[in-house]
Amino acid sequence: MSPIDLYEDVVVESYIPAKKGGQHGLVHIRPVPGGKYPTTLNVECSKTLSRNYPVGTRFKLRAKLVEKEGGGNFLYSYFGWKAEVLK
């Protein structure tokens, strides 16, 4: 399996978290409710999604699950890839 095969289409949305939890910025990105991944999972992707669109906008992007030893898993999408704006 090539590294690119580890990526899959994931629908995410922008939101303002109730607590920062050590992350930077006002607007964050998370998986949408009812999808494969829990909404508590952080998404690392292009800042364009959180800066240039209204809060609540949904996107489809290519992402992979990064499993960190000791927890702290997150979804990663290369910042240079285009995301599809869904709403």
What are these regions (language model features)?
Residues 2-22:
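Structural detector for short beta-strands of small beta-barrel domains
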Residues 12, 18, 43, 61-63:
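Short, surface-exposed loop motifs enriched in S/T, G, D/E and P with embedded aromatic residues
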Residues 66-87:
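OB-fold/S1-family single-stranded nucleic acid-binding modules
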